[in-house]
Amino acid sequence: MSDNVPTIAAVATAPGRGGVGVIRISGKNLLPMAQALCGKTPKPRTATYADFTDTDGQAIDSGLLLFFAAPASFTGEDVIELQGHGGPVVMDMLLNRCLELGARLAEPGEFTKRAFLNDKLDLAQAEGVADLIDASSRSAARLALRSLKGDFSRRIHGLVEDLITLRMLVEATLDFPEEDIDFLEAADARGKLDGLRRAVDDVLANAQQGAILREGLNVVLVGAPNVGKSSLLNALAGDEVAIVTDIAGTTRDAVRERILIDGVPVHIVDTAGLRETDDVVERIGIERSRKAVSEADVALVLVDPREGLNEKTRAILDALPPELKRIEIHSKSDLHAHAAGGFGTGAETVIALSAKTGDGLDALKRTLLREAGWQGESEGLFLARTRHVNALKAAQEELSLAALCGNHQIELFAEHLRLAQVACGEITGEFTADDLLGVIFSRFCIGK
């Protein structure tokens, strides 16, 4: 990083009152600031108890000052942490004192961004920091920690090293174009390529599982008014999150709820009945429901077996994207018989279910996990993001194209290897546009 990088400061603990509050500061040559804050010269990696003082030498608070000298710190710069009492007024006074001493307020994720720019973390590890903070289940927290500790990155670095080795081997043959030798065959380049493709496939499979655990499954409940959508949402959530009445149109807005099934987040939207209405408020809710449908991975199509596919249900089905996966739910199974063959909704799975008694809920949850593609937590799994999956798919495609190259298309073969390396490098940040970095780190919390 540049020598002109400003000193940054932020409250690193959550807003509100607590026993301890932490101010984090990062920059170059911070010993003078430490001395101004507490009147002492702290030793690196040692907790110093002191009063934290204002410009007049009056105590603002008392607590611990920790000093981490560059480069042996989280950001790779000098870092100070002030551990004081966790009241918002005290934290605000301490932060303002740091700003008076020349620091500026840190942007979201700026401490982690500096760690990345100073080679303390790669981009996948930096994202692991945010994912650990945002983890919604124990499984997600365990896998995020693996990413933070570099498990995912080591897999990617291994792929990149193998790609570089194969590229060097292939590109060296370009120095001898006049030789009538099949260098790809002689160097077993194709055998090495096959091994690389298998390795990428393996990492991609793990990344897809990690992305499922991080991002989950988007599910919409659709069906005619009063077919039991809100009752099913309440049953899945285990709480009364949606109003249930016998009046059609009770759900006037899309009701959203997140549940966990075996640690996998499932985002469920109870749609306002997809129908035409003159009610302005209900019409807004219906538009939101249509947006939720467009973003869904799976639609739970609720059907009353007594009525089958009535005109209203057919109109709703016609409004669904044809590629959207569907699970047909025969609601209120405690009141009437289940139609085993289904009603032609386009669903591969039909489940009879009673939101009142809970019969069929476990079968539905198992089906949702199957539709999500979740295979269960396994050794070596790590948390991943959609961008990681897309990058690995791009590398997979480039290696597939390389495999199609003829024996004398060495330059094209080498170019596909290079593009596969670039795709893998995007995951760890070796090849990453500045605007992407801005988006990634802007989603962190301030102080991290």
UniProtKB/Swiss-Prot annotation:
Pfam families: MMR_HSR1, MnmE_helical, TrmE_N. Keywords: Cytoplasm, GTP-binding, Hydrolase, Magnesium, Metal-binding, Nucleotide-binding, Potassium, tRNA processing. It comes from the Bacteria. GO terms for biological process: tRNA methylation; tRNA wobble uridine modification. It is an enzyme of class 3 (hydrolase). GTP binds at residues 226-231, 245-251, 270-273. Mg(2+) binds at residues 230, 251. Its cofactor is K(+). Residues 216-373 form the TrmE-type G domain. One of its GO terms (molecular function) is GTP binding. Binds 1 potassium ion per subunit. Its EC number is 3.6.-.-. (6S)-5-formyl-5,6,7,8-tetrahydrofolate binds at residues 24, 81, 120, 448. GO terms for cellular component: cytoplasm; cytosol. Exhibits a very high intrinsic GTPase hydrolysis rate. Involved in the addition of a carboxymethylaminomethyl (cmnm) group at the wobble position (U34) of certain tRNAs, forming tRNA-cmnm(5)s(2)U34. Homodimer. Heterotetramer of two MnmE and two MnmG subunits. This is tRNA modification GTPase MnmE. It comes from Neisseria meningitidis serogroup B (strain ATCC BAA-335 / MC58). The gene is mnmE.
